[in-house]
Amino acid sequence: MKFSGLWCWLLLFLSVNVIASDVGELIDQDDEVITQKVFFDIEHGEEKVGRIVIGLYGKVCPKTAKNFYKLSTTTNSKKGFIGSTFHRVIPNFMVQGGDFTDGTGVGGKSIYGDTFPDENFTLKHDRKGRLSMANRGKDTNGSQFFITTTEEASWLDGKHVVFGQVVDGMDVVNYIQHVSRDANDKPLEAVKIAKCGEWTPELSS
């Protein structure tokens, strides 16, 4: 009887650990559930380059995702991304945009005011196409963002909030990272978000 009882406790222990492991996996997966998608139609000078589609992780970073969604879907160039440029590009690292007020990397503002705090650092810069907030230090998120073009950028973890992922059009991002640029990494010819908005399946047809 004692032997049977020991086996019962062992089986119970293993079952609890398996369940906990499964729950952990579900939580990790839930972090990267795409709640909304937006698109950028990119032009380089007079040339139409293509479309970038970005999925937003609104469950893990609802406030940050909402900020980006609103800035991507407004048709007012003074209040969002339409007509703005990628002002900084570094090959094999990232492309940066979102400064719709100044265009140089010193401007931009969030839908909540000039800036808002870091929401969390749950997601990591662990693959190409990560969408993350650019900032001037802790809790200074506005509208500027960057998209990674490297497989891994762990030195950014804990400093920049990851809240989305490129789901289509990474070839366009790769094009942007390799355009000719000046000594300050600004494209010599403007790389512009000519059109942007909410992406729906109908747009793929």
UniProtKB/Swiss-Prot annotation:
Residues 39-198 form the PPIase cyclophilin-type domain. It is found in: Secreted. It catalyses: [protein]-peptidylproline (omega=180) = [protein]-peptidylproline (omega=0). Keywords: Isomerase, Rotamase, Secreted, Signal. PPIases accelerate the folding of proteins. It catalyzes the cis-trans isomerization of proline imidic peptide bonds in oligopeptides. Residues 1-20 form the signal peptide. Its EC number is 5.2.1.8. It comes from Saccharomyces cerevisiae (strain ATCC 204508 / S288c) (Baker's yeast). Belongs to the cyclophilin-type PPIase family. PPIase B subfamily. Present with 339 molecules/cell in log phase SD medium. This is Peptidyl-prolyl cis-trans isomerase B. One of its GO terms (molecular function) is cyclosporin A binding. One of its GO terms (cellular component) is extracellular region. It holds the Pfam family Pro_isomerase. It comes from the Eukaryota. One of its GO terms (biological process) is protein folding. Cyclosporin A (CsA) inhibits CYPB.
